[in-house]
Curated annotation (Swiss-Prot):
Gene3D superfamilies: EF-hand (1.10.238.10). The keyword Repeat applies. It holds the Pfam family EF-hand_7. This is Myosin light chain alkali. The keyword Repeat applies. Myosin is a hexamer of 2 heavy chains and 4 light chains. One of its GO terms (cellular component) is muscle myosin complex. Residues 7-41, 80-115 form the EF-hand domain. The gene is Mlc1. Keywords: Motor protein, Muscle protein, Myosin, Repeat. One of its GO terms (molecular function) is calcium ion binding. It comes from the Eukaryota.
Amino acid sequence: MADVPKREIENVEFVFEVMGSAGEGIDAVDLGDALRALNLNPTLALIEKMGGTKKRNEKKIKMDEFLPIYSQVKKEKEQGCYEDFIECLKLYDKEENGTMMLAELQHALLALGESLDDEQVETLFADCMDPEDDEGLIPYSQFIQRLMSDPVVFD
């Protein structure tokens, strides 16, 4: 694929190998996780458009199908960036000091937009979250930095 540099192709192949099953490819239900492991932030609608499924074992995606999907998703403009996420979380920053209630972040992740489940939120917090202070507040900018620098892969 001419528009994907060799180093990126190696990363794509590595993620594909880790997430796939011996020679069969990756399950289409894991397409979003594979793309996120490659530092992309596709929406659920985009994942579905690219061939992702909601049920396991409906479809397998082979490497020769995955690379063009990766390339296309990489070009998509509707991906959140650091500044977008910070602006969103500022809405919960009542003191305007870079902190928000951990419970509010948890509620937002569980209930709003493309929501996560309890297990995914626990994994996300374990990998990216500083401990909350005595008042239940967390610094949200460090959370977003960690989240975007080291993608979390859900089992």
